[in-house]
């Protein structure tokens, strides 16, 4: 009985240490929720943490990883499968991203949502001020203070109902 108790005690002490390793260099990726409603309390965009795996300073690598899509089943990729990052340019606080042409498969509204997610991801990685995203003939520029990036619709609804 004492052996069983000692074995049980050892397992209780050591098994919690066997859980997944904490991320050493986490980055935050932003994606649209699979199911959302505009103006809902949860919002349209959510985030997940990913491991930078020694590439914390390699924006091209991290954004290429982003374009593969989310690991969570609750999130979806904002851009069609096969979208690639063609170029990244940093100048002062402005980051310019060039993507493959998505005009045939993404509406303007979907492209704007994708740009908001990609901008939030890029700004969280770089600490920049503004992101310009081009895809074919479309180009969207969003800054850190862009209203598109701020979902305060539930806050104003709550204030109006009081």
Predicted regions, residues:
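Bimodal "functional hotspot" detector
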Residues: 3-8, 12-13, 17-162
């Amino acid at each position: 009985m004492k052996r069983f108790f000692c074995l049980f005690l050892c397992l209780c002490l050591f098994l919690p240490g066997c859980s997944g390793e904490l991320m050493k260099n986490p980055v935050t990726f932003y994606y649209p929720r699979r199911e959302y409603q505009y103006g809902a309390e949860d919002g349209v965009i959510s985030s997940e943490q990913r491991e930078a795996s020694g590439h914390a300073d390699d924006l091209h690598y991290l954004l290429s990883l982003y374009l593969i899509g989310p690991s969570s089943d609750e999130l979806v990729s904002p851009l069609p499968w096969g979208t690639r990052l063609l170029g990244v340019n940093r100048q002062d606080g402005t980051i310019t991203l060039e993507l493959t042409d998505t005009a045939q498969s993404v509406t303007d509204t979907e492209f704007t949502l994708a740009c908001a997610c990609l901008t939030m991801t890029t700004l969280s990685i770089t600490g920049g001020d503004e992101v310009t995203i081009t895809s074919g003939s479309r180009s969207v520029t969003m800054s850190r203070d862009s209203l598109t990036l701020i979902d305060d619709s539930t806050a104003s609804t709550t204030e109006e109902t009081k």
